[in-house]
A protein has these predicted regions:
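Conserved nucleotide-sensing/catalytic segment adjacent to the nucleotide-binding pocket
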Residues: 66-71, 76-126
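Phosphate-binding P-loop
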Residues: 31-37
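P-loop (Walker A) phosphate-binding loop of NTP-binding proteins
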Residues: 45
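Short phosphate-coordinating micro-motif centered on Lys-Gly-acidic
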Residues: 2-6, 13, 112-207
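Conserved lysine of the Walker
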Residues: 50
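N-terminal pre-Walker A segment at the start of P-loop NTPase domains
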Residues: 2-29
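Hydrophobic anchor at the beta1->P-loop junction of P-loop NTPases
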Residues: 40-42
Length: 207
């Protein structure tokens, strides 16, 4: 069942980190604020830190460790740990939409069955998953070496630059990220994200 998604973000926040550990820590702070039904759209070129970021989300959510990119299986479900920091919290559904060329192919993997009860993170999801929820949080990761960080005006251009799985065989084995500066852009869409998440600590003051 499709919904009418928000087309324009209610806010945008740019954060800068210098190491993979900082990327992980920022994501863990965000993960602690997430709740069942949240949809995150994760975008970043090869080596941008998508897996590190998702691992941090998992830590903040209190789900089972061992998060890797679900490139070949499309979807991995990481269950909440009863003895973790958030017992009874939502599971993490981690999706790699790289090989899915359209919204209809997203529907074929039945994310709607877990969407309301889990936190769903979709890599390469822009232009494919917006119809699943009226609210979403977009997370763009940019390496200092590679594409320049973009703001709201460049979001459409970034989507156009995402690789088409029909035209390339490049895979993202983003399992170990280098310690190098990264820019992380968060955008909130819809009523769930009417305000910025409370990230706490040093991240609150990041320009």
């Amino acid at each position: 069942v499709s919904v009418l998604p928000a087309e324009m973000p209610t806010w945008e926040q740019t954060l800068r980190v210098t190491t993979a550990d900082e990327t992980h820590a920022l994501a863990a702070a965000l993960g602690a604020e997430l709740q069942a039904g949240d949809l995150l759209v994760l975008t970043g070129e090869l080596g941008a830190g998508k897996t590190t970021f998702t691992q941090g989300l998992g830590e903040g959510l209190g789900v089972r460790a061992g998060i890797i990119s679900p490139t070949f299986v499309l979807v991995r479900i990481h269950p909440n740990l009863p003895d973790g920091p958030r017992p009874g919290g939502p599971d993490l559904v981690h999706v790699d939409a790289y090989r899915l060329g359209s919204a209809s192919e997203i529907d074929d993997i039945d994310l709607e069955n877990t969407l309301d009860s889990s936190v769903t993170v979709v890599e390469w999801g822009r232009g494919r998953v917006e119809h699943l929820s009226e609210s979403r949080l977009e997370v763009d990761l940019h390496r200092a070496i590679g594409l320049e960080p973009i703001g709201l005006a460049g979001a459409a251009e970034a989507a156009a630059r995402e690789p088409n799985p029909a035209h390339t065989e490049i895979l993202d084995f983003d399992t170990e990220d280098l310690d190098e500066p990264r820019t992380i852009v968060l955008r909130g869409f819809g009523p769930r994200w009417s305000t910025k998440p409370a990230l706490g600590g040093a991240f609150e003051g990041t320009p």
